[in-house]
Amino acid sequence: MRNEALVGYLLHQRPYQEKRALYYLFSQQHGVIHGVGKKAAPLFMPLQLFATGKRDLKTFSQINIASQDNTQADSVQKDGVQKDSTPAVLEAVPYANISGQHQYAALYINEILWRLLPTEDPMPILWQHYQISLQQLKQPLSNSELRLCLRQFEQYLFTELGFTLTLTHDNVEDPIESDSTYRFLPDVGLLPVLVHNEESEHLASESGQTVFKGADIIEMARLGITEQTLSHWSKLHRHLIDHLLDYQPLQSRLLWQQQQRYQ
């Protein structure tokens, strides 16, 4: 890669030198790319830059907020023709940014991406859904709408990572039964749990992140991610995210919890 024009979003950054930072960029062309560039690149805004380097750590130069036309990668070659790649002037592009509590949701999306996605693996469909999610987070959303936005994005992420959630059958291909109880194991699927009726509620309260009633699973499969099924999907997705992260804490989740305590 030599002086290649990229369009992407900054997911994460770390101090590197006095005037430079280590960036995790989610690019339209190559997926997540690690690079070093001048400090002060903004989050949640489309960036246009140039990347150079043969190894995993690239050099990023001319980092600027992309013009709205360039967010669809108009700056790179199409049909063998190099279009104008002049970066937009930062002050000249009137993008609205994400503010308030929605920032915590956007930070969460960024964190699960930079921690879970492989480097330099193009994911154009997920990149488009990331853009859509950021646009949603710039709008006024109720608590339910915010959670729906996150659950829907997580589902696209699971698909890219190769996880298919089967909710119509258990781990041995028997149909889900409404009056049964199931435990979800990410690498196995839904396992029937043999309990007496009087023990069912106690089991669910002790292992709430992994145990589901059959009737709830059937409803999830029938309706998808809706306000009616949102709490069940949130429980399932959280367990799968934690599994993928090897149960290491998410900093964005901790920030959200701290913010909620001080409200």
Each PLM stretch: what is its role?
Residues 1-263:
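Non-catalytic alpha-helical scaffolds and adjoining flexible linkers that form interface surfaces
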